[in-house]
Amino acid sequence: MDKLLIRGGKPLNGPIRVSGSKNAALPILLAAPLLTEKTVVDNVPRLRDIHTTLKLNEILGCPSTFEGNTVTMEPAANLNPEAPYDLVRTMRASVLVLGPLLARTGRARVALPGGCAIGARPVNLHLTALEKMGATFTLEAGYIEGRCDRLTGAHIVFDFPTVGGTENLLMAASLAEGTTILENAAREPEVADLADFLNAMGAKITGHGTSVITIEGVPSLGGGRYSVMPDRIEAATYMIAAAITGGELHLECCPFMELDAVVSKLREMGVVIEATNAGVAVRRQGQLVGVDVATQVYPGFPTDVQAQIMALMCVAVGSSSIRETIFENRFMHVQELVRLGAQIRISSQTAFIRGVGTLTGAPVMASDLRASASLVLAGLAAKGETLIQRVYHLDRGYEAMEVKLQNVGADIERLT
């Protein structure tokens, strides 16, 4: 099992290119069963979850090739409507095949999903919405089995602005009969990117990026070429890397406009962030100071950056707090940061952080994707050596992270 060894205390300086968004690429690739023509998707990050998705698509009957950062998907000759447990158990996003399979075949049998163990992310919001379009579901032997005649348009109001639920319904409704209206829909840029992709393939979707989305069903979707948006979570992580090490990074292909909430909090802490012709320049100016953060759905502060900014708070002057409002049980990185010398106290869904002068390297263990990024950031700032175990979590969401960090001056190596 791979590990990362970091010798910290070195400022990072230089350019880093932000990769394509994992959270945008996954639903775009999982839309493969909807397509009837060859489709080329560019700027796809080479990640473990992407490879799992392409394996799943192949089992469903949608073959593809992955060269560089380009995926070429061929249309399915015969769709297999079953997503097996062996693949689905490793990746929660795989539940997104429900909508496309029901829309194309009238049947879907999908194992209950796995992925990061950061609390319940119930799929009932997906199922309830699809039922309003005419699908019926049973749960048997760990599988969700759905059936329908042709899906029909419906007016759906989500109880919560679910990202996965909105994406599933965008895909299902694209081939439904009639018009579907989604209220309280997720506004995340990755949801809008999926809608833009579907429109490029022939769908008729409007309102994406707002809380009310309208989808007019079409008989079929074709193919084409599309480029995935840059990864705003990766960009935020490297912004924090510049700040926590006291260096200056220049982020290329940075989705600056989608990072308002993160940029605002980092500036409040004393981080200088400037848009340039080449991207975004990030550096620390003087002492970092503590702030209070509450995670929110977009356009609020993203839960996927909660663990990373906590690492930064650990070395800031004064007190900080983070209230996690999206997921329960997403503070599993706290005990590992404490091993590095951080002072953190948890009360219910809020973490209270008192900044310390320096962190000290120690062996730590990653518990999930963003927790692993938090430990890398802390290790970059810590004195001495930090050994991070279970970095397979990191490989699910960050493309060649140690290589990118090495190129800007980090002393980091992968041990196999």
Swiss-Prot record:
Belongs to the EPSP synthase family. MurA subfamily. GO terms for molecular function: UDP-N-acetylglucosamine 1-carboxyvinyltransferase activity. InterPro entries: Enolpyruvate_Tfrase_dom, Enolpyruvate_Tfrase_sf, MurA_subfamily, RNA3'P_cycl/enolpyr_Trfase_a/b, UDP_GlcNAc_COvinyl_MurA. Pathway: Cell wall biogenesis; peptidoglycan biosynthesis. The modification 2-(S-cysteinyl)pyruvic acid O-phosphothioketal is found at residue 116. SUPFAM superfamilies: EPT/RTPC-like. It comes from Solidesulfovibrio magneticus (strain ATCC 700980 / DSM 13731 / RS-1). Keywords: Cell cycle, Cell division, Cell shape, Cell wall biogenesis/degradation, Cytoplasm, Peptidoglycan synthesis, Pyruvate, Transferase. It is an enzyme of class 2 (transferase). This is UDP-N-acetylglucosamine 1-carboxyvinyltransferase. Its EC number is 2.5.1.7. One of its GO terms (biological process) is peptidoglycan biosynthetic process. It is found in: Cytoplasm. The active site is at 116 (proton donor). Phosphoenolpyruvate binds at residues 22-23. UDP-N-acetyl-alpha-D-glucosamine binds at residues 92, 304, 326. The lineage of its organism: Bacteria, Pseudomonadati, Thermodesulfobacteriota, Desulfovibrionia, Desulfovibrionales. It holds the Pfam family EPSP_synthase. One of its GO terms (cellular component) is cytoplasm. It catalyses: phosphoenolpyruvate + UDP-N-acetyl-alpha-D-glucosamine = UDP-N-acetyl-3-O-(1-carboxyvinyl)-alpha-D-glucosamine + phosphate. Cell wall formation. Adds enolpyruvyl to UDP-N-acetylglucosamine.
